């Protein structure tokens, strides 16, 4: 009979678990959702959209609306592709239903 060697834990030397290494998980790309200024959409409507769709506080919604008004474009938030796409569609749908020309886009961060 051959003598088997054991380490300090009592496990036979040379035995162990074979493990597979997982490939690194890639983080999803993020997209900025942007509102574009126009001369016709009421400021109150923009604040309402920011509060309802983007869950902004009244203060944040007013600040973003003023930034859009003064600079021509403003960021509403940063989201994964699917969420950003949904938010853009919701804004465009709300604007269309209210008969406002408000435009919303997304761009890769």
Swiss-Prot record:
Gene3D superfamilies: 3.30.1390.10. Pfam families: ClpS. InterPro entries: ClpS, ClpS_core, Ribosomal_bL12_C/ClpS-like. Signal peptide: none annotated. Residues 1-23 are annotated as: Disordered. GO terms for biological process: protein catabolic process; proteolysis. Belongs to the ClpS family. Involved in the modulation of the specificity of the ClpAP-mediated ATP-dependent protein degradation. Binds to the N-terminal domain of the chaperone ClpA. NCBIfam families: PRK00033.1-2 (NF000669), PRK00033.1-5 (NF000672). This is ATP-dependent Clp protease adapter protein ClpS. It comes from Maricaulis maris (strain MCS10).
């Amino acid at each position: 009979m051959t003598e088997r060697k054991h380490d300090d834990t009592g496990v036979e030397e040379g035995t162990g678990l074979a493990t597979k290494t997982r490939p690194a998980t890639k983080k999803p790309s993020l997209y900025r959702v942007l509102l574009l200024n126009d001369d016709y959409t009421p400021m109150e409507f923009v604040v309402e959209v920011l509060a309802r769709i983007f869950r902004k506080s009244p203060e944040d919604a007013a600040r973003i609306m003023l930034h859009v008004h003064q600079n021509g474009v403003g960021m509403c938030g940063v989201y994964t592709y699917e969420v950003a796409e949904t938010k853009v569609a919701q804004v465009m749908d709300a604007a269309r239903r209210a008969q406002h020309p408000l435009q919303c886009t997304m761009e890769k961060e």
